[in-house]
Amino acid sequence: MSHVDDGFRSLTLKRFPQTDDVNPLLAWEAADEYLLQQLDETEIRGPVLILNDTFGALSCALAEHSPYSIGDSYLSELGTRENLRHNGIAESSVMFLDSTADYPQAPGVVLIKVPKTLALLEQQLRALRKVVTAQTRIIAGAKARDIHTSTLELFEKVLGPTTTTLAWKKARLINCTFSNPQLADAPQTLSWKLEDTGWTIHNHANVFSRTGLDIGARFFMQHLPENLEGEIVDLGCGNGVIGLSLLAKNPQANVVFVDESPMAVDSSRLNVETNMPEAFERCEFMINNALSGVEPYRFNAVFCNPPFHQKHALTDNIAWEMFHHARRCLKINGELYIVANRHLDYFHKLKKIFGNCATIATNNKFVILKAVKPGRRR
């Protein structure tokens, strides 16, 4: 938990999921402060759009202006909602939209936290292009090291004249004025053939490894079990290639695709519809924080390629939460399979949570682990 006084109000903010208290990561950064410093409240005219507000620092500070919070992270939405409540601000003060929704017309102010993925930034800028005016104040912010020439060129190409500020507390801002430059249409969904399958994999802008199959998933697919029955989960599904493979290998199983990214879940849905339409009735698609709210003892197996970063921050908190949720939601003798970089040492984490862990396969970079839920149902 951390405190910030941004000039609009004094806030107490925390990350979501909460980091440990030994070495906590902050729920806000200098770029949030820098963005808010640029706004004189008398200048705010028309709707306020906030893009990629990680844990609500901007939304909480500007809540009295009823801002729209736009992004592709359900975790960020949950974190923002929790910080609104914690600071005594009504959740209804902020309107939440995912990045694929239509943006409000003629905004007065647009604040953008520059996302890690340039493809997501382009998708968002193209969406803004349809609604902003020459009078809209457009300001983006990030750590100085995360603003590159390619970032500035993208703003210039999609929206118009772009300048940057000096660094402040290692953060920089981008100021942009909309001039409606000529811009060719470009597909924001990328597709490629997955070798040895006949499948075409479709990837929306914010999907991990959208330009091709990542090597961890490739290794995982080589070792997926067959002849499973009941409900199984592709947890953190991304574009759904693991779930697709499970559908093909396990015709008696139903697959639940889960991710905190609406774009990932929609990509998974699209990939089942276009590649295995006959199996669509065996699928469920869920935008969720891991398996929050899912009943215990539901699943026969969970498959997971857990992330070890949240936005720009390295953290194992999300993976740790996924493992705990999997244990709760597995049936007795249900199995959790994960693929991960070897250096992350998830073997001991799984053994601590499940009481057991076995290595299924390993190579020079990745390891596939299996843990089994022990005990009797209470």
UniProtKB/Swiss-Prot annotation:
Belongs to the methyltransferase superfamily. RlmG family. Coiled coil: none annotated. Signal peptide: none annotated. GO terms for cellular component: cytoplasm. Specifically methylates the guanine in position 1835 (m2G1835) of 23S rRNA. It is found in: Cytoplasm. It catalyses: guanosine(1835) in 23S rRNA + S-adenosyl-L-methionine = N(2)-methylguanosine(1835) in 23S rRNA + S-adenosyl-L-homocysteine + H(+). It holds the Pfam family MTS. Keywords: Cytoplasm, Methyltransferase, rRNA processing, S-adenosyl-L-methionine, Transferase. Its EC number is 2.1.1.174. The keyword 4Fe-4S does not apply. This is Ribosomal RNA large subunit methyltransferase G. GO terms for molecular function: 23S rRNA (guanine(1835)-N(2))-methyltransferase activity; nucleic acid binding. Transmembrane segments: none annotated. Its main location: cytoplasm. CDD domains: AdoMet_MTases. It comes from Salmonella arizonae (strain ATCC BAA-731 / CDC346-86 / RSK2980).
